Amino acid sequence: MATDELASKLSRRLQMEDEGGEATEQPGLNGAAAAAAEAPDETAQALGSADDELSAKLLRRADLNQGIGEPQSPSRRVFNPYTEFKEFSRKQIKDMEKMFKQYDAGKDGFIDLMELKLMMEKLGAPQTHLGLKSMIQEVDEDFDSKLSFREFLLIFRKAAAGELQEDSGLHVLARLSEIDVSTEGVKGAKNFFEAKVQAINVSSRFEEEIKAEQEERKKQAEEVKQRKAAFKELQSTFK
């Protein structure tokens, strides 16, 4: 290595003398002189690279503000649910993933408005169109109007932290799911059990109302049948 370096320096000095250059390198200063000569180029190159990167970011931001291009989606970033959602056990996250895949009818990794509508209907808590949109907007970090798995997990994080309004659709979803997201030991388990009992009571009342409507329709049909029979009997008396 030392021999090659020395040969290179001697070759450079001979070349400079042949060209009539007067800048003779002094022993011991060769490295410093070379560094000084190359430093401006490297600095300019670094500054140019930084300027290009900044310009690209500013142009992208301007495009996004004008509605051109797509913003980088947090939900599409590769993430590890077990490290990002440490408040949940592996079993809890597996249960959430199973539920998410169950209602991801399109198998595209998202739950869209219609799939969320079907989910809430199957859970026994149908929502209005505006209600469904509001549910998505509450955790829709990338504003794509659908739920990624990460955003789906955010629902249960907010539920466990008590950050959801009790009358909100997301609170109902978390409450009616079969996933226990309690993180407060016995107290959390007690609250979860009470919430499940309340959900069962709501479901029972809903079933009772349906049964009452069915009984009312049967009663009305029977009355119509009896009136028709009485009318026919009355007709027969005049024959």
UniProtKB/Swiss-Prot annotation:
* Gene Ontology MF term list: calcium ion binding
Annotated positions binding Ca(2+) 2: 140, 142, 144, 146, 151
For this UniProt record, the keywords arranged alphabetically read as follows: Acetylation, Calcium, Membrane, Metal-binding, Phosphoprotein, Repeat
- Major location, coarse class? membrane
Q: Which residues carry this modification: N6-acetyllysine?
A: 232
Residue positions annotated to bind Ca(2+) 1 are: 104, 108, 115
Q: Where is the EF-hand domain?
A: 91-126, 127-162
Positions modified as Phosphoserine?
Answer: 11, 73, 75
One matching Pfam family is AIF-1
The answer, when asked if Acetylation is one of the entry's keywords, is: yes
Q: Note the PANTHER family from the entry.
A: EF-HAND DOMAIN-CONTAINING PROTEIN D, EF-HAND DOMAIN-CONTAINING PROTEIN D2
Instruction: Write the protein's name.
Output: EF-hand domain-containing protein D2
Lineage, opening ranks: Eukaryota, Metazoa, Chordata, Craniata, Vertebrata
Name of the coding gene: Efhd2
